[in-house]
Amino acid sequence: MINLLVENNNSNWDKIFSFVFDIFLFIFDVIWNTKLPMTNTSIAYFLIFFMVIKLSIYAIHGTSTQYNNLGSTVNNGVSQVYSSTVRGVSDTKQGMQKHIKERKQFKINRNKKQLSSLAKQAKTREQGYRRVHK
């Protein structure tokens, strides 16, 4: 764990200050340019939201040595998930094509059933009409 209170460790304080300062500048820039009426609650939501975004950018890009381990961990995790997903999709390409064919066939069959039930309804109406008007 990083000890932020050590005097030799001023670079961490600089990073924290620049991070918070960037967030505040960005938020008030957004408020000023959009001229949105802001309450304390909405400003707090903005702060939390953009801090999460900024931290995720640090984590993904690894902009400093402090964040490199976290960034590489995030990148490895994302790449593993992506590669396994791609592998799964390429393995199941034929399965997907089969599934799409089954869905099309199901829709065709459902439409046929609906048409046949409509035809039956029309036939019974016609028979009823004939009975009444004989």
Curated annotation (Swiss-Prot):
Query: What membrane topology does the UniProt entry give?
Result: Multi-pass membrane protein
The cellular location(s) given in this protein's UniProt record come to: Host membrane
Segments crossing the lipid bilayer: 16-36, 43-63
User: Which controlled-vocabulary keywords does the entry list?
Assistant: Host membrane, Membrane, Transmembrane, Transmembrane helix
Single GO cellular component annotation?
A: host cell membrane
* Keyword Transmembrane helix attributed: yes
Q: What protein family is recorded?
A: Belongs to the plectrovirus ORF5 family.
This chain belongs to the protein called Uncharacterized protein ORF5
